């Protein structure tokens, strides 16, 4: 989930077999610095998770047989496994690692996260950057008992994966159930299965983003790559994780503006606040409009589900726009920080999505926020 979102999982597994299978090593020297860098990248997550990070190197010995595997000879397979174990052993001796069985880790996790005390709200936070392909791309994963979200800085901070755990679905899996193989929790947004912003057909894929428009020109923030910085603050007594994105410049034919995005994840709240700040505008009198939107559906695969049971609603004065999805017992809504024009849109057969949004004229130095709220709908 953290790193293999865009490609081959072999490139992001921290046991040596995966790194060899991904061919991320020097064929002449049989060295694989990427393996150690990747392990260290997982270790780095302790900075964002109250001093804790987790990594696993679980492999059976079968792939080290003397007949070799894939294109690697036995000697390289054995060397890579030995080197990997030695690196973990070195970290342990330096007091930088504690090795546990899975049952020991389960006990540690329940205590660490407050589950034993009946107070499980602390999230898992994973800022992740590409250290393999040279893309300079960043993702951020947020997961707590109420939701899981992925923010893609390569798409201007768009939310590209969203799971509404707050519904706490009973979802039996296995033989004799409706879900024999598919153990996935249903998504509201999933850009790989439901296209995201970059769709090849008429219509739209699932994404939570914003558009800026001026005199018939339109720019989606999905087209504005940037980077983010993670912080944690207590706001109104609530622990909040904050992503502060680097400002982006948006240039229309006769107006240029600089916009900054902040995304707030309040612990235990099941909502995400997205705040847009206009830092500068070349013409303060220009008519520029902001369209905050979420295009969503539900499902676990790339195949559309039955959308006929979904109810879209817009409250008087557009204090909230919402969708209730009975099939996954979920209500999703957007609410604004100031008066704005709320709207709802139905999908159609070739683009089976629904859309919720707010449109507002924005001015220089203005700050406008919207909340994406998730609730259980009985």
What role is predicted for each listed range?
Residues 1-107, 361-364, 371-375:
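Catalytic grooves of carbohydrate-active enzymes
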Residues 26-40, 50-60, 234, 244-249, ...:
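Beta-strand-rich recognition/accessory modules
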Residues 63-68, 148-150, 169-173, 246-259, ...:
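Short, surface-exposed beta-strand/loop "edge" segments at domain boundaries and coil↔beta transitions
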Residues 99, 294-316:
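Solvent-exposed beta-hairpin/edge-strand motifs
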Residues 110-151:
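Surface beta-strand/loop "capping" patches
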Residues 146-153, 255-267, 321-336:
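Broad, structure-driven detector of short, well-ordered beta-strand segments within folded domains
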Residues 148-251:
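Acidic-aromatic substrate-binding/catalytic surfaces of carbohydrate-active enzymes
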Residues 239-304:
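Acidic, contiguous internal or C-terminal segments within carbohydrate-active enzymes
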